[in-house]
Amino acid sequence: MNEQYSALRSNVSMLGKVLGETIKDALGEHILERVETIRKLSKSSRAGNDANRQELLTTLQNLSNDELLPVARAFSQFLNLANTAEQYHSISPKGEAASNPEVIARTLRKLKNQPELSEDTIKKAVESLSLELVLTAHPTEITRRTLIHKMVEVNACLKQLDNKDIADYEHNQLMRRLRQLIAQSWHTDEIRKLRPSPVDEAKWGFAVVENSLWQGVPNYLRELNEQLEENLGYKLPVEFVPVRFTSWMGGDRDGNPNVTADITRHVLLLSRWKATDLFLKDIQVLVSELSMVEATPELLALVGEEGAAEPYRYLMKNLRSRLMATQAWLEARLKGEELPKPEGLLTQNEELWEPLYACYQSLQACGMGIIANGDLLDTLRRVKCFGVPLVRIDIRQESTRHTEALGELTRYLGIGDYESWSEADKQAFLIRELNSKRPLLPRNWQPSAETREVLDTCQVIAEAPQGSIAAYVISMAKTPSDVLAVHLLLKEAGIGFAMPVAPLFETLDDLNNANDVMTQLLNIDWYRGLIQGKQMVMIGYSDSAKDAGVMAASWAQYQAQDALIKTCEKAGIELTLFHGRGGSIGRGGAPAHAALLSQPPGSLKGGLRVTEQGEMIRFKYGLPEITVSSLSLYTGAILEANLLPPPELKESWRRIMDELSVISCDLYRGYVRENKDFVPYFRSATPEQELGKLPLGSRPAKRRPTGGVESLRAIPWIFAWTQNRLMLPAWLGAGTALQKVVEDGKQSELEAMCRDWPFFSTRLGMLEMVFAKADLWLAEYYDQRLVDKALWPLGKELRNLQEEDIKVVLAIANDSHLMADLPWIAESIQLRNIYTDPLNVLQAELLHRSRQAEKEGQEPDPRVEQALMVTIAGIAAGMRNTG
């Protein structure tokens, strides 16, 4: 353990030293000394020295406006470098990779040792693997793209420096390169000046594909194949690629008026353009590699006399020409030019696959398997994973937008007001129209701009090549008519295929009603005929936690999934559960392996579909090696969950969870909704108001510009509490409920649940992680600096609650301290705290200065505003999750 961490610590201190030299060169010795003093005070304050803690507070309060920005940037940049070192550590032979034997191999060995599982059963489970990762542009990726590229390069330098055999001059060159990169980062503005547009967000997603996933996916499949051969003597079929990527960037219009039908059309074209660009590079390599002459009669017949001399090259050059023509056409379309489709335009994956696979089969048959299984195999697998669209997109829209559109239409037609009809009347109307052969939309109707936008979006879906749009997600879905309405709007747009439409259940009530809604839908003959035995349902994690608190929400999510699984099984429907998890605990984020094994039995039978959000995309897929490791973790967890499902739930455990849910929800809502002091306290004790100024994502932070906590999106709500280190949404109510059940004499039952039920142990583990990142003295400091004295008692009450919660969680888990079973995470948090604490203290000071100036009617000082943005980004890096 220590030896492993000494490698990480030495990398962190080396990067810190280089950053120090950069600061000295840029700003002079006195600023570096100031930063060093603050760092030492912070370290000593963390070790429990109260006098130094006091001195730390005074030093930061007394910084002049000119010193604010350099100090904030120094600690913020250091945390980015520490994250980079930690990311490298997770894949380094000296780091976790060394002590973490291959996860797939470990899972396969575990499965082979189960007497009830035959090798054939395991093979079948592998063949039915399905993993779809949905990349979302949540405004939580704070770091600018240009800095991410520099950090990827820093990572590459660390990798080369790890090589024992490099010559001195190479070592010196690498160190010089590191110094250049860190200096470039220091002299780059880390805060975006403008909000990214939805197209910028989509380009960020494509950059992740190009820089990491393009290489990572074939590498992961090689790894998987190797482990299967070694452990089961089984080779993966060439066409078997269990992983797909979908994106919400450019498709998610829920609450984001900037995502229009035109934007979606543009992003679809851009995505296809990027795919042709990446495949052209692959094909170029194959043109130069596949110079072989010997080929099967089938391949020779395919190329004819013209290509007989170099049949493989001939096919590759043909494919290259088609890709170039396709790219030129897409480029013209992106510029707004309307050109006729060229001959050979690539629109379907088969058109890419067939010539490549013909070469593959011929090479195998002619004894050149070693060549077939090289770059050619990687390209074939990319065709299966990415294909012509590169990444498919989901469309997401709020249910009320569809209801309003149909209301406007029925009023125009003079048949009543759809919006005011009962659910039964709505369903009768929708089913009648869905069965009707005549169109419903009148030709000369001029709808409102909002309705026009909904109809235009359906038009874009109908026109897009089949397979480029993955699903239509309806947020805030509450009734069967919400789902039928979308099917009707798509039918009216002339869609020629059955598009998966997924209701998203995201509040406590909606989760509790989800099974009733789906049962009603599955009882409609027309609907059963349409879906052809497949249904997708999305479970919302973030909004349910904001609505009811984390304990009640997670139990409602579990029960909704459990009921849906049983209903679909009974109806013979293959259910895909789509998990809308976030990066942070308050939004359902948990280490992937633990989270998947804690779901109800059978929940992964239809594969895993999960959102990967904002900043988590970079932590989990930022480098090809990390992509391999993340995909392997998911693979191991899905196989284990499907083949060794957790036992059916004990009735007594269910009763305890019901009780915990009611108590925790009442306490949570008692504070968040009913305590009149809560919203003013939240607004002053956190940077919630100021977060709106950060140009993070293309989507507004609020659903409605006025209003309390309920109108805030889940992300800024959690982001704000993470900044002041109280982490309130991720624990409020949970500990109090546990304490009440302990007082009722059920502690031993809770301990058994913690031991034997993955769902419950994961909940407690997530609470421990939150408590380890929370910090009560810092939360108290925010109160003292920013909150009206009349509200101090509320802050104290909340902090006391957290202290009590920590005690009860440790008692049930039988641990003496937090994170006892994950010492490396505890170590990582401690390492960061030394750098995050000064940013927190500084942030409270900056908020104080900024609000003071506003109160006095002064213009905000740009130095204060800029430094505030930097502390927000820095604390997010220190906490390793934002919203």
UniProtKB/Swiss-Prot annotation:
Which Gene3D superfamilies does the record associate with it?
A: Phosphoenolpyruvate/pyruvate domain
Reaction catalyzed: oxaloacetate + phosphate = phosphoenolpyruvate + hydrogencarbonate
Question: What does this protein need as cofactor?
Answer: Mg(2+)
Q: Does the keyword Lyase apply?
A: yes
Q: GO CC terms on record?
A: cytosol
Q: Does the keyword Lyase apply?
A: yes
Q: What is its EC number?
A: 4.1.1.31
GO molecular function terms listed in the Swiss-Prot or TrEMBL record: magnesium ion binding; phosphoenolpyruvate carboxylase activity
One Pfam family of this chain: PEPcase
What biological process terms from GO does the record include? carbon fixation; oxaloacetate metabolic process; tricarboxylic acid cycle
Q: Which domain of life is it from?
A: Bacteria
UniProt keyword annotations, A-Z: Carbon dioxide fixation, Lyase, Magnesium
**Residue positions of the active site:** H138, K546
Task: Extract the PANTHER family matched here.
Answer: PHOSPHOENOLPYRUVATE CARBOXYLASE (PTHR30523:SF6)
Q: Which family does it belong to?
A: Belongs to the PEPCase type 1 family.
Cited function: Forms oxaloacetate, a four-carbon dicarboxylic acid source for the tricarboxylic acid cycle.
* Protein name according to UniProt: Phosphoenolpyruvate carboxylase
Organism per entry:
Shigella dysenteriae serotype 1 (strain Sd197)
Q: Which gene encodes it?
A: ppc
